[in-house]
């Protein structure tokens, strides 16, 4: 990816309760082996000199303390004014950004480089549907339907979003996201609602 871009890492909520034996931590500073999640994610982008915005809310002070040595011109921790859904968090992050963005969920470490893929992109894998993840249908590379953490009574294999997305036209995506956040769709997170319509 030759153009400048911004990396957005949403980390507004604490890790799930079953992972809190190490403390009530946001995913971005959750320990993995001898590092934290941030170290693994940042390794994917540091040689590209991309700016990184980490968006926090719950225990944001812990994130600021843990990352104080790396926060600077290229890496910023931004605090949400209030907590809503993922779509609101990402809208807040891209509100004044016009360059392309990579959205990398704080709990997602993918060793493949999404920046080497041309155009809009996201990573996915196939698995049996569960209400834990967000799945989708696609036709010829176009997302046609999204199942956001829907309960299912039968074993059906679908594609699921892994948590790394690249958006080239940030302006258009921001407008879709703004509409999705304002609609407050109760069946689907506004981020996925916008993805389905962009």
Sequence positions of predicted segments:
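Conserved N-terminal catalytic core of the sugar/cofactor nucleotidyltransferase
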Residues: 1-18, 30-31, 35-100, 183
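Structural motif
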Residues: 10-13, 55-59, 105-107, 125-127, ...
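Short glycine-/acidic-enriched loop or helix-start segments at secondary-structure transitions
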Residues: 18-20, 63-66, 89, 112-115, ...
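Short alpha-helical oligomerization interface
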Residues: 23-27
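Short, conserved catalytic or adaptor-binding loops enriched in Gly and charged residues
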Residues: 67-71, 137-138, 196-198
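Short beta-strand-to-loop acidic/aromatic patch adjacent to the donor-nucleotide binding site
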Residues: 99-109
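Conserved core of the sugar-phosphate nucleotidyltransferase
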Residues: 109-185
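Catalytic core and acceptor-binding pocket of nucleotide-sugar-dependent glycosyltransferases
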Residues: 180-198
């Amino acid at each position: 990816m030759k153009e400048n871009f911004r990396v957005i890492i949403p980390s507004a909520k604490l890790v799930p309760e079953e992972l809190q034996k190490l403390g009530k931590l946001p995913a971005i500073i959750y320990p993995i082996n001898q590092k934290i999640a941030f170290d693994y994610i940042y390794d994917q982008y540091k040689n590209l000199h991309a700016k990184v915005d980490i968006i926090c809310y719950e225990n944001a002070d812990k994130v600021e303390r843990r990352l104080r040595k790396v926060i600077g011109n290229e890496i910023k921790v931004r605090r949400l004014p209030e907590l809503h859904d993922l779509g609101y968090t990402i809208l807040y992050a891209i509100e004044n950004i016009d360059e392309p963005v990579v959205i990398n969920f704080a709990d997602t470490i993918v060793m493949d480089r999404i920046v080497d893929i041309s155009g809009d992109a996201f990573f996915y894998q196939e698995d049996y549907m569960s209400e834990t993840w967000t799945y989708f249908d696609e036709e010829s590379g176009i997302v046609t339907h999204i199942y956001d953490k829907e309960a299912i009574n039968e074993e059906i294999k679908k594609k699921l979003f892994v948590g790394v997305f690249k958006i080239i036209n940030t302006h258009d995506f921001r407008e879709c996201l703004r509409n999705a956040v304002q609609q407050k769709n109760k069946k689907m997170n506004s981020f996925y609602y916008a993805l389905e319509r962009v």
